[in-house]
Amino acid sequence: MASSSLSSLSSILSNPHGCSLCFKASTQRCFALRFLSSKATHASSSSSSALLPRCRSSTHRLTQKPINRKKGFSLNLSRSFSISQIASSGKFDGPSLHQFVSNAQAHASLTTPETESESTLDSDIASKGRIYHETYGCQMNINDMEIVLAIMKNSGYKEVVTDPESAEVIFVNTCAIRENAEQRVWQRLNYFWFLKREWKVNAATGRAKSLKPPKVVVLGCMAERLKDKILDSDKMVDVVCGPDAYRDLPRLLEEVDYGQKGINTLLSLEETYADISPVRISENSITAFVSVMRGCNNMCAFCIVPFTRGRERSRPVESIIREVGELWESGVKEVTLLGQNVNSYNDDSADRESGANWEYSEGFSSRCKVKNMGLRFADLLDRLSVEFPEMRFRFTSPHPKDYPDELLYLMRDRHNICNLIHLPAQSGNSRILEQMRRGYTREAYLDLVKKIRSIIPDVAITSDFITGFCGETEEEHQETLSLVRAVGYDMAYMFAYSMREKTHAHRNYTDDVPEEVKQRRLTELIDAFRETTGPCYDSQVGSTQLVLVEGPNKRAPETELIGKTDKGHRVSFVTKPLFDKACLLDGDDLKRNPGIGDFVEVQIEKSTRASLFGEALAISKMSLFHDVGVVDAVVASCAS
């Protein structure tokens, strides 16, 4: 029986037109191969098992590339497909699918224990489908995509590809903060719709790169905001999933297999994905994002985030410590803590000393009262900076109201918390700030800047600004320009106002500033920023900065490296052999070239007012750099 089955199988494999008993040649996979392989596997010796995977149950697996009339077809053990996938792809010329399944199941029941104990299928073979993904918008979306990849990996989708034509699932993680961001997404969805149509043509000629037409999945803020419009858009999208429903993605994708649209955009009061270890998009990166809280309670008039991301909720401290520990073990040297309003972090699952009060920045207020006070953002930073003394920490995006003195003094005293504060102003006029529902005045904002610089003298301050908000006059716009000049920001994100549906502004205000006026004011704002940011960079010339090396400088990849200081300034330098201060303390005075992930002390020699250039002095560590007097004598003696 074994020789007969193998003979039949060999005949099929040698036939360039496939199996005459099964699906139409050149367009489909051959189901007969699966049935015959189960019989051959059961009865043959180990020589036959080298060709085909073992049958494990009624869902026998065998993978192969699409049939090509000119080249025949070949077995490909890197992919897999199920009986239901094959059955839905074509018509029979011979025995029915029911007959094949019945015979295969009957034979599988006779499988010996020895066969059942064979090694499991390769992880790639067991993959349910290949994933292609694109992400638009903020860092939170990047981190969310890593959470999605982890969920999909645990559900059997183990392979990520860089070509959308090779994918069975296409994820588009979207941003709804501005109209331009949404327009880019619609353009991409049109392209993916074209790929779905093209797949049918390619499959008919054996040229399809994926096993099935791709399922297009919209994630993120647009999913919640425009779910009905997206699903009605001429079958462009198969699944719409909001930021709090990513655990439901495997089920939603299965619904598509049954001809249904998959949709879940419910917002949650509890979901933080605290138990999920994200699959890093850049596996070898020495920097990473870690989400510590989700949602926002501030309800600013212009902002769609509370409506697409929901209310604030924070991860437990211990889950964050665990994730950062995993990153440290994998070689990550810098972590950016993320949240829509990151410094309003409140782990109310933890105990807090009685009598503690929720403090805001002086002169700032909030529209949302805190019901249960737990561990705050300063408590989280305190734990992280102590437990990981050689890891650098940043955080974004905060609200100016949540900078109590406790947080500022902690940033001053901990060497591994970056001297960088993001302080979104949005406007420099008090009336517009009130219209925006920001909870502070121009004067309160400037007082906070003054306090920050008195506590952390060498701090870098960055900001966000909106031009052309509803009812903004020329005089009010000029006050924004004067605020930029007064503060002197190291960096700023600046945009023309874009009205968003559902927001307070959409319900109550008129978008009455003409688009050309918005753009002109934006240009003036950018010019004012450039006038003041140059001195921030120029002031670094002559100083020694600790630079975390991120890779070769693209302008001179063979000779220069580039990295960032704790203030976020880009610094490039010529690579050369350097002493490693940590090794010097152990008596090793050999020099080596710095590499990605090294902290390098660099003396700044030149400023381009957008980046810095300097001379590398030594490879170091954060703890050594901030106590350099201890090892300077050792370095000098070795150099002599």
Swiss-Prot record:
Keywords: 4Fe-4S, Iron, Iron-sulfur, Metal-binding, S-adenosyl-L-methionine. Its cofactor is [4Fe-4S] cluster. [4Fe-4S] cluster 2 binds at residues 296, 300, 303. GO terms for biological process: regulation of cyclin-dependent protein serine/threonine kinase activity; tRNA modification. Residues 282-535 form the Radical SAM core domain. The keyword 4Fe-4S applies. Coiled coil: none annotated. [4Fe-4S] cluster 1 binds at residues 138, 175, 221. Residues 129-258 form the MTTase N-terminal domain. Pfam families: Radical_SAM, TRAM, UPF0004. Belongs to the methylthiotransferase family. MiaB subfamily. This is CDK5RAP1-like protein. It comes from Arabidopsis thaliana (Mouse-ear cress).
